[in-house]
Regions:
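Structured segments of extracytoplasmic/periplasmic soluble domains
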Residues: 99, 373, 377-381, 414, ...
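Conserved catalytic-core segments centered on acid/base and nucleophilic motifs
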Residues: 362-381, 531-559
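The catalytic-center signature of Zn2+-dependent metalloproteases
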Residues: 391-414, 536-592
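Bacterial N-terminal signal peptides
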Residues: 9-19
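Conserved catalytic/binding loops enriched for acidic/polar residues
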Residues: 520, 528-533, 558-945
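Signal peptide processing junction and immediate N-terminal pro/mature segment
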Residues: 19-39
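Auxiliary tRNA-acceptor-end handling modules of aminoacyl-tRNA synthetases
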Residues: 34, 47-117, 121-359, 377, ...
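Positively charged n-region of N-terminal signal peptides that target proteins for export
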Residues: 1-6
Length: 945
């Protein structure tokens, strides 16, 4: 160990000694160097040495840095010279488009594997285009059906430095020819940025740029995620990794892009979608049709509230001298005469509809006839061959034909797992002018081939009634019934002209016609409905939906144009139509007198249709302003008072505030009460015939059709009875302008005598013992379907296999009382006391209901006792609610009357419950009712009203 230490000391000493020996010699020799090392230095000398040392140190650091950077260069780092050069702003044009294929058209489109690039020039920025979005592939259920429109919007491309914004343009606020106000509008109202896309490359020669459109086309810009939440009641998220293109096509005036998108529900609990293989992944097709708007905007036509057209509206802030800022244009096609001086001329460009290849061959002729039924109306407006039906071309005839291409107006056939809407006729318009640019009609197969509504067996009678009678949706309290709130939101999303309730009501009408034909022996059990009947119905449906595409709204008042006693006169109906307008929802015409049966559905457009088309499409000579043209058309609109021009639309019919007695769906004739009585009579005749089972089931057949027949008859009875409800608290409305001939007032209360008659009709046919009941021998034969499938699971939770007649009757009773005791109806009854000399008073309504439901049958007995007790409970519920927690808008008089009737009823119940001969069920019902009344009378009001 000692030896190792000695060796270490010697090694260190040797190293120190040799370090002196290897000092670099100066010019003065080694001795001089050693001497300088030992010699003390002056201050100036020390300073020079320090400066020299600093320079040497700096040189070493630079050499070290250079060596380090040289090594980094070998790894791909830029040299200092290269780093000083300006970095390219975009990728090279050729680099981006390597292996890409090009299409020339409205935009030059480059496709490269999964990417789609638009090539944009300076002249394409800040220029409005129209985008039309539709579903090209659905899931076959819940309104998510291929072919349905999604939305349409006006947008532009706006460059902001290194990006391009796709802006949805705000067309709602304008100030024509006023730059200062335009600046103010721009300050106050903005656009919506749909996407902001980075510029991929810029062509050095022509300065055109490339943008990758994936962020737009493969995104949820269609808002289908929210739509799925509405229809499924579950939020859904787009899986962007699974988004692909199915088709990208460029044409001279339009671009068609079809994307396949996968959405995943974020919550699958309780979600049952048998039409989707795996409901974790819902595959939807979204089609984008991008159009150049007309370079010369169509001359707009100012709307007139006396004529029913869809509108394009905006606020014009230059109208500060008018009653409001709104301008309304009627939506119309650009139809111009070849010969402007001729009374009747062919158009320069007719409206052409193609009957798509999806329409079954056997129905195509009826579809064409439905389209061209409008020729009659256009001839009244001065046009010949204005609307033409054509077969869709084959690929050989027109390789570019595509029903999703907005250049083609089509009639298409779609299938769905369950009926949704029946048929729809959406159109797309130029938001600047109201010009209709494109339209399509979609028809659901299930509307014709599956008359009965599949969901009946699962949703129950209450849901069925809400489907066929949309007013029940509007009357439901959204706070109490979230399903009603969801339904209303869905209708807003889909569009008013979508005819959501049409499919249900039309299917019920067809089922009733089918049943009537069976009952009359015109068909054998098990037979398909003869094509002539289906064809008649289909022709009417197509004509109705094409009417929407021409700009026309619903006209639910038009049935009053045809006299009730002429409904089965084929000559009269062939000339003026079954109703004044094909835009009505008409019930099938089934005469109680079989020997006088006329058309089942209208064979012609009506008098209102011809008048409305005349107003909308007549060419006014000269180059008049929109205001001058409106004045010239005033003479046509001034004929609105004529009976054959009666008009009332959705808002006059559906909402709780709809008050026009004559605006209703699925009725016929100018006397609604007479029609309702006849329809009830037809239903009762079918029951009373005694051959219903024989005619419907047949020898060896299943009993299931008998069950469907009973459901159909109950729905038809409800629709007829509810038709009378609109008389109570009703008014006759009109749209006169001051100076119009006819002398109509905007509102006239229904005479009290008619209101009393209507209420008695409701009581007699719905509330009296024996109403809405079935022959006992039929009840045990109403078997349900016992063949399982995905729509008919055998082990559905809570499902009943016997027929729930008690539930059906209770649902009808509740639906009728909801309407009769609606706050707005009650408001009108209260205010009628001021308007009329002999008013129908609110006390009459309450007394009429209380007498019929309670006092005239205090202790129900017999087979219908349970139904009567349910009716009493339902009515009592409504009186209690009015007393304890009245609905918003309920007049004070109604609350006071409800309390009065509860007080009187309490006394009567107390007396009745002491009878000794009552059943336990009757006593229990009376005591429970008495207890509820006592609690209600003792309770404090829970709401301000």
């Amino acid at each position: 160990m000692m030896k190792l230490r000695i060796l270490a000391i010697l090694f260190v000493a040797f190293a120190v000694a040799t370090s002196y020996a290897f000092v670099a010699p100066s010019s003065g020799g080694s001795d001089r160097a050693v001497a300088m090392a030992d010699e003390p230095k002056t201050d100036e000398g020390q300073k020079k040495d320090d400066e020299k040392g600093d320079k040497e140190k700096e040189a070493k650091e630079k050499k070290k840095e250079h060596s380090y950077r040289t090594k980094l260069d070998a790894r791909g780092r830029k040299t200092p010279a290269e780093a000083s050069q300006k970095k390219p702003k975009y990728k090279k044009w050729k680099e981006v488009l390597e292996d890409a294929t090009a299409q020339e058209g409205l935009f030059k489109i480059w496709t490269k594997r999964e990417d789609v690039f638009f090539e944009l020039g300076e002249d394409q920025f800040d220029k409005p285009y129209l985008a039309i979005l539709s579903l090209s592939k659905g899931i076959g259920t819940r309104f998510v059906l291929g072919g349905l429109p999604i939305t349409d919007l006006m947008f532009d491309f706006h460059r902001v430095e290194d990006h391009v914004q796709i802006r949805m343009l705000n067309t709602l606020f304008r100030a024509p020819d006023d730059p200062e106000l335009e600046n103010a509008i721009e300050l106050s109202y903005g656009n919506s940025i749909l996407a902001q896309l980075p510029i991929e490359s810029e062509n050095e020669k022509d300065k055109k740029i490339l943008v990758n459109m994936n962020e737009l086309f493969l995104s949820d810009v269609s808002d289908m995620g929210y739509f799925l939440q509405l229809v499924l009641d579950k939020p859904a998220r787009l899986d962007s990794k699974k988004a692909i293109y199915r088709k990208v096509k460029a044409y001279a005036q339009n671009v068609e892009v079809d994307a396949l998108l996968t959405y995943s529900p974020m919550d699958r609990s309780g979600l049952y979608l048998p039409s989707v293989p795996d409901n974790r992944y819902m595959e939807l097709g979204v089609h984008y049709s991008i159009h150049m708007l007309p370079s010369e905007p169509m001359k707009s036509r100012l709307a007139d509230d006396r004529v029913g057209y869809f509108l394009t509206a905006y606020k014009d802030f230059t109208r500060d001298g008018e009653e409001d800022f709104f301008v309304h244009y009627a939506n119309r096609w650009r139809l111009e005469k070849k010969d402007p001086d001729a009374d009747i001329s062919e158009p320069v460009k007719p409206i052409v509809f193609y009957v798509d290849h999806t329409v079954p061959k056997k129905y195509q002729r009826y579809v064409k006839e439905g389209i061209e039924m409008w020729q009659k109306a256009f001839e009244a407006a001065g046009f010949k061959n204005a609307i033409i039906a054509k077969d869709a071309p084959t690929p050989e005839q027109d390789p570019e034909y595509d029903p999703e291409d907005a250049r083609y107006n089509t009639i298409r056939w779609i299938v769905s797992d369950e009926p949704s809407f029946g048929a729809i006729g959406p159109s797309r318009v130029d938001p600047r002018t109201g010009e209709i640019l494109d339209a399509d009609v979609l028809i659901e197969q299930s509307m014709l081939t599956s008359f009965r509504l599949i969901y009946r067996r699962f949703a129950g009678p209450q849901a069925t009634l809400m489907e066929v009678d949309p007013i029940l949706t509007y009357l439901a309290d959204p706070e109490i019934d979230p399903e009603a709130a969801r339904r209303l939101e869905l209708e807003k999303k889909l569009d008013a002209r979508m005819d959501l309730h049409f499919g249900a009501g039309f299917s019920e009408g067809l089922e009733f016609l089918h049943l009537a034909l069976l009952a009359r022996g015109a068909m054998e059990p098990g037979m398909d409905v003869p094509e002539q009947y289906i064809g008649e119905a289909l022709r009417w449906v197509v004509c109705h939906e094409v009417g929407h595409t021409l700009g026309l709204r619903h006209n639910f008042k038009s049935s009053v144009s045809t006299p009730f006693d002429k409904l089965n006169d084929r000559l009269v109906v062939g000339e003026i139509g079954m109703t004044g307008s094909i835009m009505d929802y008409a019930a099938p015409n089934v005469s109680r007198d079989r020997s006088r049966q006329g058309f089942y559905y209208s064979p012609s457009v009506g008098t209102w249709d011809q008048w409305a088309i005349t107003w909308g499409y007549t060419q006014i000579p000269g180059n008049k302003s929109a205001q001058k043209e409106a004045e010239a058309l005033g003479s046509i609109a001034g004929e609105a008072h004529l009976k054959e021009h009666a008009y009332g639309t959705d808002e006059d019919t559906y909402p709780a505030g709809a008050m026009d007695t004559l605006c209703a769906i699925f009725d016929l004739g100018d006397d609604p009460l007479a029609w309702a009585k006849e329809r009830i009579g037809v239903c009762q005749d079918i029951f009373a015939d005694g051959k219903l089972e024989e005619r419907v089931v047949g020898e060896g057949g299943s009993y299931l059709p008998l069950r469907y027949a009973v459901e159909t008859l109950l729905v038809q009875e409800y629709l007829a009875i509810s038709r009378a409800v609109k008389y109570v608290g009703g008014q006759f409305t009109a749209r006169p302008h001051k100076g119009d001939t006819g002398g109509e007032l905007p509102m006239t209360p229904v005479p009290a005598a008619q209101q009393r008659e209507a209420l008695q009709f409701v009581i007699q046919n719905a509330f009296m013992p024996g109403a809405l009941v079935l022959p006992p021998e039929v009840m045990n034969k109403l078997a349900d379907n016992k063949i399982p499938d995905w729509q008919n699971p055998m082990f559905a939770f809570g499902r009943r296999f016997d027929f729930p007649l008690v539930d059906w009757v209770a649902a009808i009773h509740n639906a009728l009382l909801v309407q009769l005791m609606n706050p707005m109806l009650i408001q009108r009854v209260v205010e009628a006391g001021y308007k009329a000399d002999d008013p129908y008073r609110l006390s009459e309504l309450f007394s009429g209901l209380t007498d019929a439901i309670w006092y005239n049958n205090m202790t129900p007995s017999g087979k219908t006792a349970v139904m009567q007790r349910n009716l009493q409970r339902i009515y009592l519920d409504k009186l209690v609610t009015m007393t304890v927690k009245p609905y918003t808008g309920l007049p004070h008089e109604a609350v006071a009357l409800a309390r009065l009737h509860l007080t009187r009823l309490q006394t009567r119940i107390d007396q009745a419950s002491k009878q000794g001969s009552l059943s336990d069920e009757a006593v229990a019902h009376l005591l429970e009712s008495k207890s509820r009344i006592e609690r209600a009378l003792d309770a404090k009001l829970q709401a301000e009203y």
